[in-house]
Amino acid sequence: MFEKRTWIRLPRNVVVGHGVLGQTIEAVSELHLTGRPLVVSSPTPHDVAGKQVVAQFEDEGYDPSEIVIEEASFDAVQQVIDHASDIDAGFLLGVGGGKAIDITKMAADDLGLGFVSVPTAASHDGIVSGRGSVPEGDTRHSVAAEPPLAVIADTEVLAEAPWRLTTAGCADIISNYTAVRDWQLAHRLKNVHYSEYAGALSQMTAEMLVESADSIKQGLEESSWIVVKALVSSGVAMSIADSSRPASGAEHLFSHQLDRLVPDGALHGHQVGVGSIMTEYLHSGQKGKWRDARDALAAIGAPTTADELGIDDETVIEALTTAHQIRDRYTVLGDGMSEEAAIEAATVTGVI
């Protein structure tokens, strides 16, 4: 008897391009959201775009409220929940990078309210996915939530963000290639459910970004266009799979372990990018495609070595040998690799 079923939750509106921040009201109106809007941002994004979003709602006769959060934490999520309850918010808008959007996403999910994502930096695929990431102590928690009802990504705003945030977003996408390989491996060895559609979309997105790496340059709005479209595709792949598997494999375990060992280390995207160089080597050996990943990262100015991450060699090896302990997710790391094997992988690929 056939009993398969799936429920794919996707954004209804994805508005990307030059000056689209000015279309926020139009995009929200099409969603038929009612009630008082709550705009959530962090300090810099509040100045860059949050004030403009609030002003748009005021001009249209809404009574918007706003809250500026200082850090990504479960306490901040609760602050947003409490504020939204106090003002009887009808829907939430997250304006910013990963911090504000993840917190808004999780708060909206807890409240059962609609959520609109307004990224000010193309730094990771959380701008469209149904997962939030929040640190707690030396651990970073990945929490399931509803994806945004709409994404409004103004490439003019994104192009003004610090370039390192854009290169982190690129690296996050490039790492999808090894994430999919890990997913396929888990399917073959552990019978983990694998979605051909989600896997193909994620892999294609990574490959297209690698091919476009030479065109991604600082100061070009076109670069933001390329990167944000890739981030949207990656988020959609996760929604189709109802899992972070299409975009999170051993390279993400490596990054999360680095977060534990070096809490104020490099950007998430940069860490997974370096991780993907080594995990691709583990998948395909010395003649594999790890050079393609490394060269693409180098072309956009993203780190490819421990030194460029600002992390010492010993910590990289420790993270690689213990990354499998982060969560119960089968990857090429299996039940752990020896220190000798980790040193070889990091040395051959030039990471250390």
From Swiss-Prot:
GO terms, biological process: glycerophospholipid metabolic process; phospholipid biosynthetic process
Presence of the UniProt keyword Cell cycle in the record: no
GO CC annotations on file: cytoplasm
Chief site of localization: cytoplasm
Pfam families: Fe-ADH_2 (PF13685)
Cofactor binding description: Binds 1 zinc ion per subunit.
One GO MF term: glycerol-1-phosphate dehydrogenase (NADP+) activity
Binding site for substrate: 125, 172, 256
Catalysed reactions listed for this entry: sn-glycerol 1-phosphate + NAD(+) = dihydroxyacetone phosphate + NADH + H(+); sn-glycerol 1-phosphate + NADP(+) = dihydroxyacetone phosphate + NADPH + H(+)
Subcellular location: Cytoplasm
InterPro entries reported in the protein's UniProt record: G1P_dehydrogenase_arc, G1PDH, Glycerol_DH
Disulfide cysteine pairs (residue numbers): none
EC number: 1.1.1.261
Gene3D superfamilies in alphabetical order: 3.40.50.1970, Dehydroquinate synthase-like - alpha domain (1.20.1090.10)
Annotated NAD(+) binding sites: 98-102, 120-123, 129
Pathway entry: Membrane lipid metabolism; glycerophospholipid metabolism
Record-linked CDD domains: Gro1PDH
Cofactors that this protein relies on: Zn(2+)
Keywords: Cytoplasm, Lipid biosynthesis, Lipid metabolism, Metal-binding, NAD, NADP, Oxidoreductase, Phospholipid biosynthesis, Phospholipid metabolism, Zinc
Residues that coordinate or bind Zn(2+): 172, 252, 268
Role: Catalyzes the NAD(P)H-dependent reduction of dihydroxyacetonephosphate (DHAP or glycerone phosphate) to glycerol 1-phosphate (G1P). The G1P thus generated is used as the glycerophosphate backbone of phospholipids in the cellular membranes of Archaea.
Family affiliation: Belongs to the glycerol-1-phosphate dehydrogenase family.
Name listed for the protein in its UniProt record: Glycerol-1-phosphate dehydrogenase [NAD(P)+]
Taxonomy of the source species: Archaea, Methanobacteriati, Methanobacteriota, Stenosarchaea group, Halobacteria
Gene name, Swiss-Prot/TrEMBL: egsA
